[in-house]
């Protein structure tokens, strides 16, 4: 364990959080941590922008380590991470200045990329070269993980595995969040402690498929609507994740705007409900009336769901409405 990013003289944001592990046999692993305070906003930006601040910092960190330790192509070098960390590892494998040194990328629940990012990858390598780099990438995802389907998945299907996971005990958001916890992907010893062996391989679960459906819908939107929707959803996750003691801004100071809220409610939400209705009709063969009742139940759940972020969101909407009324 050496050269952690948080000991580099303030060169990197705390959210970058990376370090190098060197094994006795000389193999080197560069590991990136997943989302923390400010990172959810960066996740949203990753669905609409060519690159994000945290992706670029992850790449910079890898290049710094490669130059500092004089790594060459004769070294065995692996990049890895969970969630946002997995996304960073993928980005490093493609876009770092020393990307040619990466032998393999192992992403755990790491999300995909925007159309704009993929275009930049292809511009750098050409189509054939891009496909060749992707062969280095391997994905390990919880069967019902809801993060890895976000954006455009670039890891080849033949290199992707879904792992049977157990949700957190309890109910509500905590149980839901457990579907994305890395420790749930590993087997347990007789004392219930996680060991360094992945759980049984399985197929993608219902929640994972539903997240993939939502992501496909989101990525099909015009850029302005896609940006508003991504910011809306990720702002909710940011508020929920940091709680009362944290902030609600991205690492670059970005946050949800009133324009994002307006676009999401007026243009994106109706399209989403229509898409969900069509999906229900197609997948389950329900008649339209039955499908509409199901959609109504989802809407009612959203309205009456309890929690601090819902209160903050409703308050923000009310404040926005008051401001608009005062302008009339």
Segments the model singles out, each with a brief description of its role:
Residues 2-28, 32-76, 96-328:
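Alpha/beta hydrolase fold serine-hydrolase catalytic domain that processes acyl esters and thioesters
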């Amino acid at each position: 364990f050496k050269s952690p990013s948080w000991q580099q003289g303030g060169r990197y944001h705390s959210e970058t959080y990376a370090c190098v592990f060197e094994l006795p046999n000389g193999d080197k692993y560069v590991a990136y941590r997943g989302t923390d305070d400010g990172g959810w906003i960066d996740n949203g930006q990753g669905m609409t922008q060519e690159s994000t601040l945290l992706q670029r910092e992850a790449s910079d960190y890898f290049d710094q380590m490669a130059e500092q330790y004089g790594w060459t192509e004769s070294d065995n070098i692996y990049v890895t991470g969970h969630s946002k960390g997995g996304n960073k590892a993928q980005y490093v494998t493609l876009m770092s200045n020393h990307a040619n040194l990466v032998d393999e990328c192992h992403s755990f629940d790491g999300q995909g990329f925007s159309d704009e990012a993929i275009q930049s990858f292809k511009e750098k390598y050409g189509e054939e070269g891009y496909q060749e780099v992707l062969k280095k990438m391997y994905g390990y995802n919880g069967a019902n993980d809801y993060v890895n389907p976000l954006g455009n998945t670039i890891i080849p299907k033949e290199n992707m595995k879904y792992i049977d996971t157990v949700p957190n005990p309890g109910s509500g958001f905590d149980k839901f969040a457990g579907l994305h916890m890395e420790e749930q992907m590993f087997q347990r010893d007789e004392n219930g402690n996680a060991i360094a062996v992945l759980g049984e391989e399985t197929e993608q679960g219902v929640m994972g498929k539903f997240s993939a459906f939502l992501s496909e819908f989101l990525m099909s939107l015009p850029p302005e609507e896609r940006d508003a929707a991504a910011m809306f959803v990720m702002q909710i996750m940011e508020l929920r994740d940091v709680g009362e003691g944290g902030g609600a801004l991205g690492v670059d100071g970005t946050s949800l705007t009133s324009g994002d809220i307006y676009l999401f409610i007026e243009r994106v939400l109706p399209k989403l409900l229509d898409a969900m209705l069509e999906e229900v009709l197609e997948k389950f063969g329900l008649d339209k009336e039955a499908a509409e009742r199901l959609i109504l139940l989802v809407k009612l759940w959203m309205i009456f769901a309890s929690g601090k972020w819902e209160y903050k969101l409703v308050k923000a909407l009310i404040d926005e409405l008051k401001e608009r009324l005062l302008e009339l």
